[in-house]
Design a protein with these regions (language model features):
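Short, well-formed alpha-helical segments that are part of the catalytic scaffolds
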Residues: 20-33
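Short beta-strand/loop segment that forms part of the nucleotide-sugar
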Residues: 38-47, 69-71
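A conserved acidic beta->alpha catalytic loop
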Residues: 45-55, 75
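Glycine-rich, basic loop-to-helix element that forms the pyrophosphate-binding segment
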Residues: 72-91
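Short beta-strand-to-loop acidic/aromatic patch adjacent to the donor-nucleotide binding site
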Residues: 94-103
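Conserved donor NDP-sugar-binding/catalytic core segment of glycosyltransferases
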Residues: 109-140
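Acidic donor-binding loop at a coil-to-helix junction in glycosyltransferase catalytic cores
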Residues: 184-197
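Catalytic donor-sugar/metal-binding loop of nucleotide-sugar-dependent glycosyltransferases
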Residues: 197-215
Length: 309
Protein backbone atom coordinates (compact mmCIF):
# COMPACT_ATOMS: atom_id res chain seq x y z
CA UNK A 1 0.00 0.00 0.00
CA UNK A 2 1.54 3.32 -1.06
CA UNK A 3 1.91 6.12 1.46
CA UNK A 4 0.72 9.54 0.35
CA UNK A 5 3.20 12.35 0.89
CA UNK A 6 1.91 15.08 3.22
CA UNK A 7 0.89 18.19 1.34
CA UNK A 8 3.19 21.17 1.65
CA UNK A 9 1.64 24.33 3.14
CA UNK A 10 0.45 26.72 0.44
CA UNK A 11 1.72 30.28 0.89
CA UNK A 12 0.65 33.37 -1.04
CA UNK A 13 3.40 35.99 -0.99
CA UNK A 14 2.30 39.57 -1.69
CA UNK A 15 5.06 41.78 -3.11
CA UNK A 16 4.74 45.52 -3.75
CA UNK A 17 7.28 46.84 -6.25
CA UNK A 18 8.35 50.24 -7.56
CA UNK A 19 11.48 50.91 -9.63
CA UNK A 20 12.67 47.52 -8.44
CA UNK A 21 15.06 46.35 -11.15
CA UNK A 22 18.26 46.72 -9.14
CA UNK A 23 17.51 44.16 -6.41
CA UNK A 24 14.28 42.32 -7.28
CA UNK A 25 16.09 39.33 -8.84
CA UNK A 26 17.84 38.54 -5.56
CA UNK A 27 14.62 38.93 -3.57
CA UNK A 28 12.64 36.62 -5.86
CA UNK A 29 15.39 33.98 -5.87
CA UNK A 30 15.35 33.91 -2.06
CA UNK A 31 11.57 33.36 -2.17
CA UNK A 32 11.94 30.61 -4.78
CA UNK A 33 14.54 28.93 -2.53
CA UNK A 34 12.15 28.58 0.43
CA UNK A 35 12.01 25.00 1.68
CA UNK A 36 8.98 22.77 2.35
CA UNK A 37 6.39 25.24 0.98
CA UNK A 38 4.29 25.60 -2.14
CA UNK A 39 4.52 29.28 -3.05
CA UNK A 40 2.63 31.69 -5.27
CA UNK A 41 4.20 35.14 -5.61
CA UNK A 42 1.68 37.87 -6.49
CA UNK A 43 3.31 41.17 -7.48
CA UNK A 44 1.83 44.63 -7.89
CA UNK A 45 4.15 47.04 -9.69
CA UNK A 46 3.46 50.72 -9.07
CA UNK A 47 3.88 52.98 -12.12
CA UNK A 48 7.67 52.98 -12.42
CA UNK A 49 10.44 54.84 -14.19
CA UNK A 50 12.28 51.63 -15.04
CA UNK A 51 11.15 48.44 -16.78
CA UNK A 52 10.35 46.44 -13.64
CA UNK A 53 6.96 45.20 -14.88
CA UNK A 54 8.20 44.14 -18.32
CA UNK A 55 11.25 42.47 -16.78
CA UNK A 56 8.95 40.50 -14.46
CA UNK A 57 6.78 39.46 -17.41
CA UNK A 58 9.88 37.84 -18.93
CA UNK A 59 10.95 36.40 -15.57
CA UNK A 60 7.60 34.59 -15.29
CA UNK A 61 8.80 32.24 -18.02
CA UNK A 62 11.53 31.06 -15.63
CA UNK A 63 9.70 31.38 -12.31
CA UNK A 64 6.25 29.99 -13.02
CA UNK A 65 5.07 30.73 -9.47
CA UNK A 66 4.98 34.47 -10.27
CA UNK A 67 1.67 36.21 -10.98
CA UNK A 68 1.35 39.91 -11.88
CA UNK A 69 -1.53 42.28 -11.27
CA UNK A 70 -2.42 44.67 -14.08
CA UNK A 71 0.09 47.47 -14.58
CA UNK A 72 -0.29 51.19 -15.24
CA UNK A 73 -1.85 52.84 -12.19
CA UNK A 74 0.03 55.12 -9.80
CA UNK A 75 -0.40 54.16 -6.13
CA UNK A 76 2.19 56.54 -4.74
CA UNK A 77 3.33 54.58 -1.68
CA UNK A 78 4.27 51.08 -0.58
CA UNK A 79 1.25 50.97 1.74
CA UNK A 80 -1.22 51.84 -1.03
CA UNK A 81 0.39 49.24 -3.25
CA UNK A 82 0.06 46.59 -0.53
CA UNK A 83 -3.55 47.64 0.10
CA UNK A 84 -4.23 47.00 -3.58
CA UNK A 85 -2.70 43.52 -3.23
CA UNK A 86 -4.74 42.71 -0.12
CA UNK A 87 -7.99 43.81 -1.78
CA UNK A 88 -7.42 42.14 -5.16
CA UNK A 89 -5.66 38.91 -4.15
CA UNK A 90 -7.63 35.68 -4.33
CA UNK A 91 -6.97 34.18 -0.90
CA UNK A 92 -8.78 30.91 -1.56
CA UNK A 93 -6.72 27.72 -1.49
CA UNK A 94 -3.90 29.29 0.56
CA UNK A 95 -2.94 28.32 4.10
CA UNK A 96 -0.80 31.38 4.85
CA UNK A 97 -0.14 34.88 3.48
CA UNK A 98 3.20 36.74 3.59
CA UNK A 99 4.32 40.27 2.76
CA UNK A 100 7.51 40.82 0.77
CA UNK A 101 9.57 43.87 -0.10
CA UNK A 102 11.39 43.98 -3.44
CA UNK A 103 14.97 44.33 -2.24
CA UNK A 104 15.64 41.99 0.71
CA UNK A 105 16.97 38.45 1.07
CA UNK A 106 14.90 35.84 2.89
CA UNK A 107 16.52 33.14 4.97
CA UNK A 108 15.82 29.79 3.32
CA UNK A 109 13.65 28.52 6.20
CA UNK A 110 11.81 31.80 6.82
CA UNK A 111 8.37 30.58 5.85
CA UNK A 112 8.44 27.04 7.20
CA UNK A 113 9.90 28.18 10.53
CA UNK A 114 7.15 30.75 10.96
CA UNK A 115 4.48 28.30 9.83
CA UNK A 116 5.59 25.90 12.55
CA UNK A 117 5.58 28.71 15.13
CA UNK A 118 2.05 29.69 14.13
CA UNK A 119 0.86 26.11 14.43
CA UNK A 120 2.63 25.49 17.75
CA UNK A 121 1.47 28.70 19.42
CA UNK A 122 -1.97 29.13 17.85
CA UNK A 123 -1.38 32.68 16.57
CA UNK A 124 -2.73 34.48 13.50
CA UNK A 125 0.45 36.40 12.78
CA UNK A 126 4.20 35.96 13.12
CA UNK A 127 6.94 38.52 12.55
CA UNK A 128 10.58 38.57 13.54
CA UNK A 129 13.75 40.48 14.08
CA UNK A 130 15.67 41.25 10.89
CA UNK A 131 19.34 41.62 9.99
CA UNK A 132 19.86 45.02 8.38
CA UNK A 133 22.79 45.19 5.99
CA UNK A 134 24.49 47.91 3.96
CA UNK A 135 26.52 47.93 0.75
CA UNK A 136 29.71 48.65 2.73
CA UNK A 137 29.38 45.34 4.60
CA UNK A 138 27.92 46.74 7.81
CA UNK A 139 25.30 44.54 9.51
CA UNK A 140 23.01 45.15 12.47
CA UNK A 141 20.24 43.11 14.07
CA UNK A 142 17.04 45.14 14.37
CA UNK A 143 15.42 43.92 17.57
CA UNK A 144 11.62 44.05 17.58
CA UNK A 145 10.99 40.98 19.75
CA UNK A 146 10.70 42.61 23.16
CA UNK A 147 7.68 41.32 25.13
CA UNK A 148 4.42 42.67 23.76
CA UNK A 149 2.61 45.26 25.85
CA UNK A 150 -1.10 45.58 26.47
CA UNK A 151 -1.57 48.41 23.96
CA UNK A 152 1.62 48.35 21.90
CA UNK A 153 -0.38 47.68 18.72
CA UNK A 154 -1.87 51.18 19.02
CA UNK A 155 1.61 52.73 18.96
CA UNK A 156 3.79 50.57 16.72
CA UNK A 157 4.02 47.66 14.32
CA UNK A 158 5.20 44.16 15.21
CA UNK A 159 8.33 44.74 13.15
CA UNK A 160 9.10 45.18 9.45
CA UNK A 161 6.28 43.97 7.22
CA UNK A 162 8.75 41.93 5.16
CA UNK A 163 8.95 39.51 8.10
CA UNK A 164 5.15 39.04 8.41
CA UNK A 165 3.34 35.72 7.93
CA UNK A 166 -0.43 35.68 8.51
CA UNK A 167 -3.51 33.50 8.30
CA UNK A 168 -6.16 34.04 5.61
CA UNK A 169 -8.56 34.91 8.45
CA UNK A 170 -6.41 37.92 9.36
CA UNK A 171 -5.97 39.02 5.75
CA UNK A 172 -9.73 38.92 5.30
CA UNK A 173 -10.17 41.10 8.39
CA UNK A 174 -7.67 43.62 6.98
CA UNK A 175 -9.52 43.53 3.66
CA UNK A 176 -12.82 44.20 5.45
CA UNK A 177 -11.35 47.37 6.94
CA UNK A 178 -9.81 48.50 3.64
CA UNK A 179 -13.11 48.12 1.80
CA UNK A 180 -15.25 49.67 4.56
CA UNK A 181 -16.04 53.25 3.52
CA UNK A 182 -16.43 54.23 7.18
CA UNK A 183 -12.98 52.94 8.16
CA UNK A 184 -9.79 55.00 8.21
CA UNK A 185 -7.72 51.94 7.27
CA UNK A 186 -6.71 53.19 3.81
CA UNK A 187 -5.33 56.36 5.41
CA UNK A 188 -2.79 54.45 7.51
CA UNK A 189 0.70 55.06 6.14
CA UNK A 190 2.21 51.75 7.34
CA UNK A 191 0.48 48.58 6.16
CA UNK A 192 2.36 46.39 8.64
CA UNK A 193 1.25 48.48 11.63
CA UNK A 194 -2.36 48.37 10.40
CA UNK A 195 -2.24 44.58 10.02
CA UNK A 196 -0.80 44.03 13.49
CA UNK A 197 -3.32 46.42 15.05
CA UNK A 198 -6.29 44.70 13.42
CA UNK A 199 -5.12 41.30 14.64
CA UNK A 200 -4.72 42.47 18.23
CA UNK A 201 -7.92 44.53 18.18
CA UNK A 202 -9.86 41.35 17.41
CA UNK A 203 -8.33 39.75 20.48
CA UNK A 204 -6.21 37.37 18.42
CA UNK A 205 -2.61 36.57 19.21
CA UNK A 206 0.61 37.52 17.43
CA UNK A 207 4.12 36.18 17.94
CA UNK A 208 7.38 38.10 17.39
CA UNK A 209 10.29 35.73 16.82
CA UNK A 210 13.75 36.71 18.05
CA UNK A 211 15.55 34.84 15.24
CA UNK A 212 16.07 37.10 12.18
CA UNK A 213 14.23 35.74 9.14
CA UNK A 214 15.16 38.43 6.61
CA UNK A 215 18.34 40.16 5.52
CA UNK A 216 16.94 43.70 5.37
CA UNK A 217 18.71 45.73 2.70
CA UNK A 218 19.46 49.36 3.52
CA UNK A 219 20.04 51.86 0.73
CA UNK A 220 19.23 55.46 -0.16
CA UNK A 221 15.65 54.66 -1.11
CA UNK A 222 14.77 53.02 2.21
CA UNK A 223 17.01 54.78 4.73
CA UNK A 224 14.07 54.88 7.16
CA UNK A 225 13.78 51.12 7.17
CA UNK A 226 16.07 50.19 10.04
CA UNK A 227 15.95 53.57 11.79
CA UNK A 228 19.74 53.39 11.82
CA UNK A 229 21.95 56.43 11.49
CA UNK A 230 21.40 60.07 12.34
CA UNK A 231 19.65 60.89 9.06
CA UNK A 232 16.88 58.37 9.74
CA UNK A 233 16.59 59.43 13.37
CA UNK A 234 16.36 63.09 12.34
CA UNK A 235 13.60 62.33 9.83
CA UNK A 236 11.66 60.41 12.49
CA UNK A 237 12.12 63.26 14.97
CA UNK A 238 10.74 65.75 12.44
CA UNK A 239 7.74 63.51 11.82
CA UNK A 240 7.13 63.31 15.56
CA UNK A 241 7.49 67.07 16.00
CA UNK A 242 5.15 67.83 13.10
CA UNK A 243 2.44 65.57 14.50
CA UNK A 244 2.62 62.73 11.96
CA UNK A 245 3.07 59.99 14.56
CA UNK A 246 0.29 61.28 16.82
CA UNK A 247 -2.10 61.48 13.86
CA UNK A 248 -1.32 57.87 12.91
CA UNK A 249 -1.92 56.72 16.51
CA UNK A 250 -5.25 58.58 16.54
CA UNK A 251 -6.34 56.80 13.34
CA UNK A 252 -5.24 53.39 14.61
CA UNK A 253 -7.10 53.98 17.89
CA UNK A 254 -10.24 54.90 15.95
CA UNK A 255 -10.02 51.76 13.79
CA UNK A 256 -9.38 49.43 16.73
CA UNK A 257 -12.15 50.92 18.86
CA UNK A 258 -14.50 50.42 15.92
CA UNK A 259 -13.54 46.75 15.69
CA UNK A 260 -14.04 46.03 19.39
CA UNK A 261 -15.28 48.97 21.50
CA UNK A 262 -13.07 49.23 24.55
CA UNK A 263 -13.40 51.73 27.39
CA UNK A 264 -9.67 52.17 27.87
CA UNK A 265 -9.01 52.67 24.16
CA UNK A 266 -11.93 55.09 24.01
CA UNK A 267 -10.44 57.12 26.88
CA UNK A 268 -7.08 57.13 25.11
CA UNK A 269 -8.76 58.44 21.97
CA UNK A 270 -10.38 61.26 23.95
CA UNK A 271 -7.03 62.21 25.50
CA UNK A 272 -5.37 62.28 22.09
CA UNK A 273 -8.09 64.64 20.84
CA UNK A 274 -6.93 67.39 23.21
CA UNK A 275 -3.59 68.95 24.03
CA UNK A 276 -3.43 70.41 27.52
CA UNK A 277 -1.62 69.76 30.80
CA UNK A 278 -4.33 67.40 32.04
CA UNK A 279 -4.25 65.24 28.89
CA UNK A 280 -0.43 65.16 29.00
CA UNK A 281 -0.46 63.81 32.54
CA UNK A 282 -3.11 61.24 31.67
CA UNK A 283 -1.23 60.16 28.53
CA UNK A 284 1.90 59.51 30.58
CA UNK A 285 -0.01 56.77 32.39
CA UNK A 286 -0.30 54.89 29.08
CA UNK A 287 3.43 54.87 28.30
CA UNK A 288 4.18 51.57 30.07
CA UNK A 289 1.52 49.86 27.93
CA UNK A 290 2.44 51.59 24.69
CA UNK A 291 5.85 50.49 23.36
CA UNK A 292 7.78 47.23 23.66
CA UNK A 293 11.26 48.72 23.93
CA UNK A 294 12.25 50.38 27.22
CA UNK A 295 14.12 53.06 25.27
CA UNK A 296 11.05 53.75 23.14
CA UNK A 297 8.89 54.05 26.28
CA UNK A 298 11.33 56.56 27.74
CA UNK A 299 11.42 58.57 24.51
CA UNK A 300 7.63 58.54 24.26
CA UNK A 301 7.32 59.77 27.85
CA UNK A 302 9.83 62.54 27.14
CA UNK A 303 8.05 63.58 23.94
CA UNK A 304 4.71 63.74 25.79
CA UNK A 305 6.23 65.81 28.61
CA UNK A 306 7.85 68.23 26.14
CA UNK A 307 4.67 68.55 24.09
CA UNK A 308 6.31 67.06 20.98
CA UNK A 309 3.90 64.09 20.81
Amino acid sequence: MSMLKPLKPRVLVLMASYNGLQYIDTQIKSIADQVDCEITLLISVDKSEDNTFYYLEDLKKYYQFIKLLDYGAKYGSAANNFYRLIIEANLQHYDFIAFSDQDDVWEQDKLIRHIKLMQEHGVDGVSSNVLAFWADGKKKIINKSQPQRELDYLFESAGPGCSFLMTPWLMNKVREQLTDKNSLAKDIVLHDWLTYAICRAHGHRWMIDSIPSVQYRQHENNVMGANAGWKAKWIRFKRLKHGWYRREVVKIVHICNGIAPNGEIDRLGNLLATKNLFSKLKLLAYVTKARRSLLDRCLLALSIALGIF
